[in-house]
Amino acid sequence: MKKLSILVTLLVFAGLLAAQQPVLSIEKTTHDFGKIKEQNGVASVTFTLTNKGNAPLVINRVHASCGCTTPTWTKEPILPGKSGTVTAAYNPQNRPGSFVKTISVFTNAGTNATVLTIKGDVIPKPAVSN
């Protein structure tokens, strides 16, 4: 009987631990810069990530689809009910025309990456005439 009550207690405790999960919520996953001028330099946007779970959310890594986009992100764990950020900085230098770039966010909230998208249209610098 004593062994059975210990086993039941351990199973209940294990179930409670398994229920402790971070839940990632992002209100907006796409940002359209619209028309940006190449001569204005880097264009940035910050995405807000909220932890709607009951365990800390950790951003393990963030990967941009090309070298023209530099991501930065919250490095410390995001506590339940709190928010963190991922900022994407797009460098339009020598990249006139339309663009669509992705930023993959890997967290402890699941095995799949959450994909953020930035897009816009780069207006080239005016040509220098002699």
Located regions from the model:
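Sec-dependent N-terminal signal peptides
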Residues: 4-15
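Hydrophobic core residues within well-ordered beta-strands of beta-rich domains
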Residues: 43-45, 84, 99, 114
